[in-house]
């Protein structure tokens, strides 16, 4: 085993969805790099920076086992798209040495379905984003004009692999797909379109996680609407729409104390 990967962090992570982190924490491995270049990236240093440590596939397998020993609820592979062959090799090695907790594939949604098929049988839970239903925003903020179509194809493949969501007695997800959507300030119309599209296409086959924690990480000179957090009114407007649609399999974050009332 001599192929290397670069990871920025590996630790118990307590801030994923409740059915992923719970009280035990998710065994998150943050890979350096990302296949998207979102101008509002909330993990910019990891996604487009050069931070991190190069390790072998064998060491990656050891990290998976160490996280399991720390009672991680799962192994959470964060933005690992560009390292899939190495991840598969590390999972094979770790499973031979006793890895038996669910594997989560945590990504931005902009995936190739043929690549995802390589993960069939390795990944138990998919945790993709679905950022845009509007191509104009995909081009504007992520330079990915085909994001809506490509991400939808990816989620279709993920659902094909995982089937209906399954949970254990403690409420942790064992298998399934959770699609995340981060509300962007000033763009509730896009969020509503995302929810309608996901619910119409997948119904109860997926969980939808509606996130309001967008934070400006630096001043946007070109896209000034992104220089603020999502307001309480914007967030509640999107949540209300989700409930109007009849979405029951939805997860959402609590409103933050510093949010404005606008």
State where each predicted segment sits.
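Single conserved hydrophobic/aromatic residue that forms the stacking wall/gate
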Residues: 254-262
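Short glycine-enriched, charge-decorated loop/helix-capping segments at active-site entrances
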Residues: 45-51, 140-145, 222-229
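Conserved strand-turn element in the central/C-terminal portion of the radical SAM core barrel
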Residues: 142-144, 155-190, 194, 212-213, ...
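Generic structural signal for well-ordered alpha-helices
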Residues: 64, 88-91, 116, 155, ...
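Active-site beta-loop-alpha junctions enriched in small/polar residues
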Residues: 80-82, 108-110, 182-184, 211-215, ...
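Non-cysteine beta-strand/loop elements that form the S-adenosyl-L-methionine
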Residues: 122-134, 207-213
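Short helix-capping segments at alpha-helix termini
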Residues: 94-100, 201-204, 245-246
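Conserved Radical SAM active-site core
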Residues: 1-121, 125, 134-135
């Amino acid at each position: 085993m001599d192929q290397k990967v670069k990871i920025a962090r590996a630790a118990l992570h307590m801030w994923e969805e409740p059915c992923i982190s719970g009280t035990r924490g998710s065994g998150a491995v943050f890979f350096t790099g990302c296949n998207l270049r979102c101008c509002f990236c909330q993990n910019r240093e990891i996604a487009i920076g050069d931070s991190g440590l190069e390790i072998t596939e064998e060491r990656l397998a050891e990290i998976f086992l160490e996280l399991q020993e720390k009672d991680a609820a799962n192994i959470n592979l964060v933005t690992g798209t560009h390292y899939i062959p190495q991840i598969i090799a590390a999972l094979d090695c770790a499973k031979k040495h006793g890895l038996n907790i669910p594997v989560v594939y945590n990504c931005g949604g902009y995936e190739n379905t043929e690549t995802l098929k390589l993960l069939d049988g390795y990944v138990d839970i998919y945790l993709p984003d679905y950022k845009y239903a509007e191509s104009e925003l995909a081009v504007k903020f992520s330079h990915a004009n085909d994001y809506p179509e490509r991400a939808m194809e990816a989620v279709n493949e993920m659902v094909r692999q995982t089937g209906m969501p399954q949970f254990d007695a403690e409420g942790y997800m064992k298998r399934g797909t959770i699609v995340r959507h981060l509300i962007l300030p000033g763009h509730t119309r896009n969020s509503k379109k995302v929810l309608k599209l996901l619910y119409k296409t997948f119904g109860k086959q997926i969980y939808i996680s509606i996130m309001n924690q967008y934070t400006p990480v630096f001043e946007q000179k070109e896209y000034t609407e992104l220089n603020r957090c999502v307001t309480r009114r914007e967030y509640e407007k999107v949540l209300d729409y989700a409930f109007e649609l009849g979405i029951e399999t939805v997860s959402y974050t609590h409103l933050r104390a510093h949010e404005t009332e606008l």
